[in-house]
Amino acid sequence: MNEYTLTAIGRTTKKALIGAIKTTGYTYTAGAIVETVRDVLLKTVYGVSQIAKALDKGIADIIKGAVSAAGEVSEDTLLTLKATVKGIIKCASGVGADVGKIAVTATQEAIKAAGEVGADVGEATKQIVTGAIEAADEIGSGASKAVRNILKDSIKGSKDIIKAPFI
């Protein structure tokens, strides 16, 4: 019998299946396995969706905190937003997150924050999109192309900032 090093999800599945098989008896093993695996998968997907929601909220909170700090120490808000977006995207890459999705979320939230504090939204968009592209360029050519493409399609006004040809 093969021994595996199980992840937390694997251990949970194993324990749930053992319990289901013992509870239902061996007569209904296949049905118990199907139902248990379905339940574990649904819980896993739900957990992942909650992480994604928390990540989006966290990005918004980070950006609001950065804008607040910039105002408190009289720092350039747009420079702060550009650097914050750049940092978020590079960090996302480091933990294996979807860099394109994170770039869109961070860029949208930063542009929104700029508008809320009375900054020129057009100039903010230019600075923030530039920060996102710089981060993606530093990550690598695949990230660079993906971020440029998704921002062009997702962020109003970014097509004028992102010029072809690119990597």
Language model regions located:
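Extended, low-complexity, charged alpha-helical tracts
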Residues: 1-167
